[in-house]
Amino acid sequence: MTPWFLYLIRTADNKLYTGITTDVERRYQQHQSGKGAKALRGKGELTLAFSAPVGDRSLALRAEYRVKQLTKRQKERLVAEGAGFAELLSSLQTPEIKSD
């Protein structure tokens, strides 16, 4: 099973883009060359701000969704310190209990 990664890319205007991939370097190069997400095209210089392995694709999708819900301040803490990332992953791996 190929591991999936969550990554954040910083744009020239200091915005953070969140995505998932199986190959961070390849995906970053795609974004740099304008062949990645439309949201990053024409945004100037891009820098890889954060990346971390998250497991399988299902978990990666849930982690991406959760990170996209964070405030800019929380994302900046994640980039600077990895703050809360382990807890975020742990919460996503906990099986959900459905009530009848």
Curated annotation (Swiss-Prot):
Residue ranges of every copy of the GIY-YIG domain listed in the record: 2-77
SMART domains per record: GIYc
Family indicated by similarity: Belongs to the UPF0213 family.
Protein name per the record: UPF0213 protein YhbQ
Organism, scientific name: Shigella boydii serotype 18 (strain CDC 3083-94 / BS512)
